[in-house]
């Protein structure tokens, strides 16, 4: 018996929509990363992008446990000496709702060209509406 290896042009991609209202950030991110990677499919192949498209709505209503709203820090650097910036989860959710989820999912995906292709299939929206009704996404409960 030969080992099955999925071919990129044979992969069937489904669309799923997740409502993130009052869901914990890490639990949503891990499920999204698993589905973007395609590990839930029997034809999963590590070197082929077999994942599905994921739409996350109500990302502004994500929550974290404990005191992470004020204690969890995100860092970025301008490239200049002394140009490090930090912001908390709470401030990031106010300014850019959904970016914390994008960063969490991106950290769970492989680094390199395959991971970059996977993160492009994630669509995050702060409100409860999205422009992907034509794809007829299935509701995914977490």
UniProtKB/Swiss-Prot annotation:
Cited InterPro entries:
Ribosomal_uL13, Ribosomal_uL13_bac-type, Ribosomal_uL13_sf
Biological process according to GO: negative regulation of translation; translation
**What keywords are assigned to this protein?**
Ribonucleoprotein, Ribosomal protein
**Pfam families cross-referenced by the UniProt entry:** Ribosomal_L13
A single GO molecular-function term is:
structural constituent of ribosome
- Transmembrane spans: none
Q: Name one GO cellular component term.
A: cytosolic large ribosomal subunit
The answer to whether UniProt assigns keyword Ion transport to this entry is no
Which PANTHER family does the entry link to? LARGE RIBOSOMAL SUBUNIT PROTEIN UL13M (PTHR11545:SF2), RIBOSOMAL PROTEIN L13 (PTHR11545)
Say which family it is in.
Belongs to the universal ribosomal protein uL13 family.
Function of the protein: This protein is one of the early assembly proteins of the 50S ribosomal subunit, although it is not seen to bind rRNA by itself. It is important during the early stages of 50S assembly.
Q: Tell me, how does this one assemble?
A: Part of the 50S ribosomal subunit.
Q: What is this protein called?
A: Large ribosomal subunit protein uL13
UniProt source species = Ralstonia nicotianae (strain ATCC BAA-1114 / GMI1000)
User: What are the top taxonomic ranks of the organism?
Assistant: Bacteria, Pseudomonadati, Pseudomonadota, Betaproteobacteria, Burkholderiales
Q: What is the gene called?
A: rplM
């Amino acid at each position: 018996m030969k080992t099955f290896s999925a071919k990129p042009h044979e992969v069937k991609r489904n669309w799923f929509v997740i409502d993130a209202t009052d869901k914990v950030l890490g639990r949503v991110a891990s499920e999204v990363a698993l589905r973007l990677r395609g590990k839930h499919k029997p034809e999963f192949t590590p070197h082929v992008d077999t994942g599905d498209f994921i739409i996350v709505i109500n990302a502004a209503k994500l929550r974290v446990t404990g005191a992470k709203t004020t204690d969890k820090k995100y860092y970025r650097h301008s490239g200049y000496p002394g140009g490090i910036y930090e912001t908390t989860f709470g401030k990031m959710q106010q300014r850019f709702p959904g970016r914390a989820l994008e960063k969490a999912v991106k950290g769970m995906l492989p680094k390199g060209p395959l991971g970059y292709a996977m993160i492009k299939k994630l669509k995050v929206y702060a409100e409860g509406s999205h422009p992907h009704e034509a794809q007829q996404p299935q509701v995914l409960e977490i």
